[in-house]
Amino acid sequence: MEIKSDHSEHGFQFPGTFELSAVGTAGKALETELPRLLARCGVELVQERISWKHSSTGKYVSVRISFRALDREQYDAAHQVLRDHPEVKWTL
């Protein structure tokens, strides 16, 4: 069964600008490595919307990256690249 919406504002719209967050171990250069990996997988990064924040204990870092994806395949590939990194604990 396929679910479709009559309203275009529902769900993902492609092409579009999206944001992914990844949390991983601090001190592993994830702040620079994760954007580089996304760029390599073919998505266009929104450079001014890349940010990171360290946890209160300093043990973890959350990296937030905005990017443009042409289609769902490109979006899914970007998400997978982040998930595949050995230092990434989880993604949103």
Curated annotation (Swiss-Prot):
Source organism (scientific name): Xylella fastidiosa (strain 9a5c)
Taxonomic superkingdom: Bacteria
Protein name (record): UPF0250 protein XF_1271
Record NCBIfam families: PRK00907.1
Similarity remark: Belongs to the UPF0250 family.
UniProt xrefs under Gene3D superfamilies: 3.30.70.260
